[in-house]
């Protein structure tokens, strides 16, 4: 069997525990790489995070904005091979690559889409498994064929060449699962996300990038910095990203935006589209959405296409306060 066909859907209800060890092929994600003598200085002038202070064993969130502070991409940045990798949703990469390259002609830097394979290791035994394939500690580790990166306490990314990916998949002793479980964990961890449909719509703080330490307010200038700084120091940001959960009366559309409405008195008003979502087998779904940050947390929501459904805001795993 071709290794890429070994991953199957794992049907879970909203009450089922997650298996202890799972591997998935992250075809919906990819990485942009930067190599060359000017890679650090160039990227430092483009993104919200501090590239200069990023150590070999560290990973950081970051965002890349236009001049008005609207986000092209939210990514995880880490050292990979002889340069940097920016891990992000595949659908955002075409536009992000174009925008990131815009001023690169003046610098000694090569920016490209990585040909490496992205695999995701998930579950309570993920750390123990990573220890068997790496000889170092830390959140970013060099491994055979590439790099292992800790995404969260029970998740690791493997960004490796195709030959090594095949070896890992074929030797895997846990479950081979389809990538939607990675999306589920992103949602439960409220990982900031920008796919193609949400590019150039929000400033970083509306996606909670500051709450996951993806914005440095002490670094030098970068594209969109003025808006990002004003949002912090003048309080102009009125939006935040939230986890929402609710019931379904029919499958969600794969092709159209999944729009939520919020109750306003006895009426309903559009609240926006889900950035991403995951559906359980018991007609429950969870998602991420950008909403006004002064909304009452007990506000009633519903799917615009399924008005008999009810959705609610869930607690975030981190604080949005600026303290």
UniProtKB/Swiss-Prot annotation:
Record field: transmembrane: none
This protein's UniProt keywords: Cytoplasm, Folate-binding, tRNA processing
Binding locations of folate: 29, 182
Pfam families given in the database record: YgfZ_barrel
GO cellular component: cytoplasm
InterPro entries on file: GcvT/YgfZ_C, tRNA-modifying_YgfZ, YgfZ/GcvT, YgfZ/GcvT_CS, YgfZ_barrel
Top-level taxon in the UniProt lineage: Bacteria
Gene Ontology MF annotations: folic acid binding
Biological process per Gene Ontology, one example term: tRNA processing
Localization, UniProt: Cytoplasm
Keyword Repeat (UniProt): no
Function: Folate-binding protein involved in regulating the level of ATP-DnaA and in the modification of some tRNAs. It is probably a key factor in regulatory networks that act via tRNA modification, such as initiation of chromosomal replication.
Family: Belongs to the tRNA-modifying YgfZ family.
The protein, known as: tRNA-modifying protein YgfZ
Source species taxonomy: Bacteria, Pseudomonadati, Pseudomonadota, Gammaproteobacteria, Vibrionales
């Amino acid at each position: 069997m071709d290794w890429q066909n070994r991953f199957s859907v794992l049907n879970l209800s909203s009450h089922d525990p997650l298996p202890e060890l799972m591997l998935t092929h992250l075809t919906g994600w990819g990485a942009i790489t930067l190599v060359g003598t000017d890679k650090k200085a160039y990227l430092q002038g483009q993104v919200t995070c501090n590239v200069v202070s990023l150590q070999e064993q560290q990973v950081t969130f970051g965002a890349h904005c236009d001049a008005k502070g609207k986000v092209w991409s939210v990514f995880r940045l880490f050292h990979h091979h002889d340069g940097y990798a920016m891990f992000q949703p595949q659908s955002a990469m075409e536009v992000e690559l174009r925008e990131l390259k815009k001023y690169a002609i003046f610098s000694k830097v090569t920016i490209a889409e990585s040909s490496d394979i992205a695999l995701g290791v998930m579950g309570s035994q993920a750390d123990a498994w990573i220890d068997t394939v790496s000889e170092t500690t830390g959140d970013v580790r060099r491994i055979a064929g590439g790099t292992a990166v800790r995404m969260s306490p029970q998740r690791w990314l493997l960004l490796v060449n195709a030959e090594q990916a095949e070896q890992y998949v074929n030797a895997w002793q846990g479950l081979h699962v389809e990538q939607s479980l990675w999306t589920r964990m992103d949602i439960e961890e409220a990982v900031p996300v920008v796919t193609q449909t949400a590019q150039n719509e929000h400033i970083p703080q509306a996606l909670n990038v500051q709450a996951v330490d993806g914005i440095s307010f002490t670094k030098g200038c970068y594209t969109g910095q003025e808006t990002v700084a004003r949002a912090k120091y003048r309080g102009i940001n009125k939006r935040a990203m939230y986890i929402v959960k609710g019931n379904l009366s029919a499958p969600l559309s794969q092709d159209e935006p999944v729009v939520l409405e919020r109750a306003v008195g006895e009426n309903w008003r559009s609240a926006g589209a889900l950035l991403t979502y995951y559906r359980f087998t018991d007609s429950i779904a969870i998602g991420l959405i950008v909403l006004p940050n002064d909304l009452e947390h007990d506000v009633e929501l519903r799917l615009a296409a399924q008005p008999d459904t009810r959705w609610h805001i869930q607690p975030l795993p981190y604080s949005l306060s600026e303290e």
